[in-house]
A protein has these predicted regions:
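Active-site core segments that coordinate phosphate-bearing ligands/cofactors
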Residues: 3-22, 38, 43-252, 257-353
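Acidic catalytic cores of enzymes that act on phosphate-bearing nucleotides/polynucleotides
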Residues: 26-33, 92
Length: 353
């Protein structure tokens, strides 16, 4: 549970009381602070015991590139840290980007710039404070059924071959001939407590009809469409009214090596799609960049944005797919049919039938 109100960025006294009472309030003292702030310097104990010392160097290395940020002008600095998901956002994206991790589970991290209207808070999503931009937020969606569900479909309907799977996806039309398929081999998080497979005829978009199955060759496209449409519909729900939609999609995880899936993401979300150039250590690099930000601002009188700091750094992502407008329009038209089908699945789960 977060002890902080993510909108005001202040501790919530009622939650502190339940968690640890006045003793906890006394320990945490001041309100949370924004990343990029220097809180002080390391205690002399760390110098005596572990060799922390005046001067030194901060560096970040990844494969063939090494950036040296220069000597420190004071003792080792103490700066706010963050978690692995916000750190990945720092390492890979800019405000207005979306990171989609397609691994064993599926996770979306959506950077939301500051707005006079806050994003919607849903029970199916998480809202985090952005570590480097005051007033900015990160929306997070987490799904249990990710690559393992796709692999099950591959094994059953594509001869356990990704090449065959991709071929079947590319041979079938966007919209899958007015059919939607949902695959939840494990109890899902979004929508909650749903398990099983569900197939719908959506030729009448307002009245989906439950089907027993669909043609074998339709399943590879069906699972991609339902998984990504679930995310697409929720982005539309979360963003504040009048907010600009994200403009870049950055895909990570094992499926980021599959060009067919990368193109699929570009088409469903209507965004240029990128993959990371820094491998699997994005969270660690993001944490180091946050520390660098505190040091950099200190050298600049406390001024400057994170984007200004990294403006001369090597690119962290590369373009791999661009949306096809005619395909994107198909998926825009599937948002409401998707919602109708998911509503029926939720009703099915709530009645236990």
């Amino acid at each position: 549970m977060n002890l902080m109100d993510v909108l005001s960025r202040k501790w919530v006294d009622s939650i502190l009381d339940v968690t640890g009472g006045q003793q906890l309030r006394g320990k945490i003292k001041a309100e949370p602070v924004q990343g990029g702030v220097t809180l002080g310097t390391v205690h002399p104990y760390w110098t005596r015991r572990w060799g922390f010392q005046q001067g030194g160097c901060i560096h970040s290395g990844s494969h063939h590139f090494l950036t040296v940020f220069g000597p420190l002008d004071a003792d080792c600095l103490i700066a706010p840290f963050t978690g692995d998901n916000p750190a990945s956002v720092i390492a890979l994206s800019m405000p207005g980007d979306a990171i989609l991790s397609l691994g064993t589970s599926t996770t979306l991290l959506l950077s939301i710039p500051p707005s006079t209207k806050p994003p919607k808070r849903l029970t199916s999503s998480h809202l985090l404070s952005h570590p480097t931009e005051d007033g900015a937020l990160i929306a997070m969606l987490c799904y249990k059924n990710g690559s393992l569900a796709r692999e099950k479909v591959r094994d059953l309907y594509a001869q356990s071959s990704w090449d065959k799977y991709n071929e079947l996806v590319e041979r079938s039309p966007p919209g899958n001939n007015d059919t939607l398929g949902f695959y939840f081999p494990l109890p899902e998080i979004i929508p909650p407590n749903v398990q099983g497979e569900f197939f719908y005829d959506i030729s009448d978009a307002g009245s989906p009809i439950l089907k027993n199955d669909m043609p074998d060759e339709a399943h590879p496209r069906a699972i991609l469409e339902s998984q990504l449409l679930s995310i697409k519909t929720r982005i539309l729900e979360i963003l504040p009214e009048g907010a600009q939609p994200p403009h870049r999609l950055i895909i990570t995880g094992g499926s980021s090596a599959n060009q067919t899936i990368l193109q699929f993401g570009a088409d469903v979300f209507g965004m240029k799609t990128y993959v990371a150039t820094r491998g699997k250590e994005a969270a660690a690099i993001g944490g180091a960049q946050l520390a660098r930000y505190a040091w950099w601002k200190g050298r600049n009188g406390g001024n400057g944005t994170f984007e200004e700091m990294v403006s001369g750094d090597p690119e962290t992502v590369r373009l791999v797919a661009e949306p096809r407008p005619e395909v994107f329009n198909v998926y825009e038209g599937l948002v409401e049919p998707y919602r109708a089908c998911e509503g029926l699945i939720r009703a099915h789960a709530s009645h236990g039938v």
